[in-house]
């Protein structure tokens, strides 16, 4: 029988031939992106590939992941739902408001959302939060993974509009979407500075780590609103 270890609420490590990250499957018997299903003592787990998920990489890079079963989450950059599906597993009794701009990705994503009662797909530009303000309630966590040059600004706009006072921001900063020539370290430094000074009261940076070896030229950031 595989060994299973709880890493944080709703996130597990399973040892079966090799160490694998996993979440408890909210949609038993179904896979989302070709991941493996592993049954342990009557419960079904979905393996979570950190090379296909910035959030999965953050787990393995020892970030604190402020998610619980009743979390309300705003996910910016949902794509076709690979990582959103794992957030849905974790926040099984919460809500995952999922914003994606590409209509092709959204078509695939809607099929996933139709099987999971806690996912709310939103076809919109994450840089224009007022366009979906009538749908999204105040949230406990904003997770952002967008490939736009103004990533810090997008995070700040959405936090100002939706993030609870005691909420958190998890952000994957993709250096090459901001500047293809500059040093990633310099880009990361500037983006973190923008977050700290983005708006009143600004963000307090709790953790900032590169996501190697899972994602090249990416920085993971955990932040909360300053007191």
From Swiss-Prot:
It is an enzyme of class 2 (transferase). S-adenosyl-L-methionine binds at residues 82-83, 100-101, 125-126, 145-148. One of its GO terms (biological process) is tRNA processing. InterPro entries: Fibrillarin, Fibrillarin_CS, SAM-dependent_MTases_sf. Its EC number is 2.1.1.-. Belongs to the methyltransferase superfamily. Fibrillarin family. This is Fibrillarin-like rRNA/tRNA 2'-O-methyltransferase. The gene is flpA.
């Amino acid at each position: 029988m595989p060994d299973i270890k709880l890493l944080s609420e709703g996130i597990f490590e399973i040892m079966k031939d090799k160490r694998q990250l996993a979440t408890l499957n909210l949609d038993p018997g179904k896979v989302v992106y070709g991941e493996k299903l592993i049954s342990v003592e009557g419960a079904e787990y979905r393996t979570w590939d950190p090379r296909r998920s910035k959030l999965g990489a953050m787990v393995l890079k020892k970030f604190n992941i402020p998610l619980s079963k009743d979390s309300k989450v705003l996910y910016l950059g949902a794509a076709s739902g690979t990582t959103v599906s794992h957030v849905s597993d974790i926040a099984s009794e919460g809500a995952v408001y999922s914003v994606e701009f590409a209509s092709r990705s959204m078509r695939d994503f809607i099929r996933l959302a139709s099987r999971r009662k806690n996912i709310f797909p939103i076809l919109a530009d994450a840089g224009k939060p007022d366009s979906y303000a009538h749908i999204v309630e105040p949230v406990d966590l904003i997770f952002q993974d967008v490939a736009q040059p103004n990533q810090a600004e997008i995070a700040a706009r959405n936090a100002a509009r939706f993030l609870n006072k005691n909420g958190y921001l998890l952000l994957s900063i993709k250096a090459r979407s901001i500047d293809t020539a500059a040093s990633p370290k310099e880009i990361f430094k500037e983006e973190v500075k923008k977050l700290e000074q983005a708006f009143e009261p600004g963000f307090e940076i709790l953790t900032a780590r590169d996501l190697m070896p899972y994602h090249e030229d990416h920085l993971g950031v955990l932040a909360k609103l300053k007191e």
